[in-house]
Amino acid sequence: MAHFKEYQVIGRRLPTESVPEPKLFRMRIFASNEVIAKSRYWYFLQKLHKVKKASGEIVSINQINEAHPTKVKNFGVWVRYDSRSGTHNMYKEIRDVSRVAAVETLYQDMAARHRARFRSIHILKVAEIEKTADVKRQYVKQFLTKDLKFPLPHRVQKSTKTFSYKRPSTFY
């Protein structure tokens, strides 16, 4: 799965005579399209509140866009995933420009490190970390230092001549 979007899905049980206005359930779901977002919504609603698609309805579904998509932010992501040995809870920190990009990075990372597939990963919560002091993970902390510089170890100078009698040396 790739190119996720964030959807807000609001649904409820079908109204009955005993409960004319049922309680609304809202979820923020990351999916590639509305169909998958609805499907995941019903999957989680059945697990959490015992409401099936046949006995419920979706009131609204909206795509959520990032407020500042060019600003780099730190995100904390709480995840529950099923592995070959059982179910695990996990907290990861991701540095990215948007919630959706952070979740895409998370799915790639979980696939690479833990061989976890999309179907076995449940994102519980995604929160932006406002203060740099609240960042816990070293792999994110290393990018928060002031005056961060990246070395350019193998620089190649532009050759002045079109033709040369020897190969250029690129090690200085």
From Swiss-Prot:
Name one process (GO BP) from the record: cytoplasmic translation
Q: Which Gene Ontology MF annotations are present?
A: structural constituent of ribosome
Record PTM Phosphoserine, positions in chain:
S32
Top-level taxon of origin: Eukaryota
Q: Which InterPro entries match?
A: Ribosomal_eL20 (IPR028877), Ribosomal_eL20_dom (IPR023573), Ribosomal_eL20_eukaryotes (IPR021138)
One Pfam family here: Ribosomal_L18A
The cross-references to SUPFAM superfamilies, in alphabetical order and at most eight, read: RplX-like
Please tell me whether the keyword Transferase is annotated for this protein: no
Q: Which UniProt keywords apply?
A: Cytoplasm, Isopeptide bond, Phosphoprotein, Ribonucleoprotein, Ribosomal protein, Ubl conjugation
Q: Can you locate the Glycyl lysine isopeptide (Lys-Gly) (interchain with G-Cter in ubiquitin) cross-link?
A: K125, K131, K149
Q: Which GO terms describe its cellular component?
A: cytosol; cytosolic large ribosomal subunit
Task: Give the subcellular location.
Answer: Cytoplasm
Q: How does it assemble?
A: Component of the large ribosomal subunit (LSU). Mature yeast ribosomes consist of a small (40S) and a large (60S) subunit. The 40S small subunit contains 1 molecule of ribosomal RNA (18S rRNA) and 33 different proteins (encoded by 57 genes). The large 60S subunit contains 3 rRNA molecules (25S, 5.8S and 5S rRNA) and 46 different proteins (encoded by 81 genes). eL20 forms multiple interactions with RNA and proteins in the central protuberance, connecting components of core functional centers that are located far apart.
This molecule's function is given as: Component of the ribosome, a large ribonucleoprotein complex responsible for the synthesis of proteins in the cell. The small ribosomal subunit (SSU) binds messenger RNAs (mRNAs) and translates the encoded message by selecting cognate aminoacyl-transfer RNA (tRNA) molecules. The large subunit (LSU) contains the ribosomal catalytic site termed the peptidyl transferase center (PTC), which catalyzes the formation of peptide bonds, thereby polymerizing the amino acids delivered by tRNAs into a polypeptide chain.
Miscellaneous comment: Present with 54300 molecules/cell in log phase SD medium. There are 2 genes for eL20 in yeast.
What is stated as this protein's family in its record? Belongs to the eukaryotic ribosomal protein eL20 family.
Name of protein: Large ribosomal subunit protein eL20A
Query: Per the UniProt entry, what species is this protein from, by scientific name?
Result: Saccharomyces cerevisiae (strain ATCC 204508 / S288c)
Gene name tied to this protein: RPL20A
